[in-house]
């Protein structure tokens, strides 16, 4: 009988995923491309009318006047800001959220 707490991914798949991520990171590191991590929660929703953003209530430090933060639909804007600030070549492995 399977316990409901058990992971759904097999150990073999977890190893394959780890190896793939390692290979991707090695590829970019060999080419002097910097890995970055941009915020997942942002103060405004996506400007693309074809994307529906997901928001969450937030009342912590630096909370926006709306009291809500949005889950990023794409890291593109934050990455472009880094490029404009002179970061040089960058890449990111991340999650994006769309309703």
Where are these regions (language model features)?
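Class II aminoacyl-tRNA synthetase-like tRNA-binding/catalytic domains
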Residues: 1-99
């Amino acid at each position: 009988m399977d316990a409901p707490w058990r992971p759904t991914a097999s150990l073999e798949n977890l190893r394959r995923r780890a190896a793939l991520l390692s290979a991707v990171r090695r590829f970019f590191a060999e080419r002097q491309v910097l890995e970055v991590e941009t915020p997942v929660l942002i103060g405004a929703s996506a400007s693309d009318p074809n994307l529906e953003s997901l928001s969450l209530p937030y009342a912590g430090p630096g909370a926006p006047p709306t009291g809500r933060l949005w889950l990023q639909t794409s890291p593109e804007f934050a990455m472009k800001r880094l490029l404009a600030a002179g970061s040089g070549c960058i890449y990111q492995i991340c999650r994006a959220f769309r309703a």
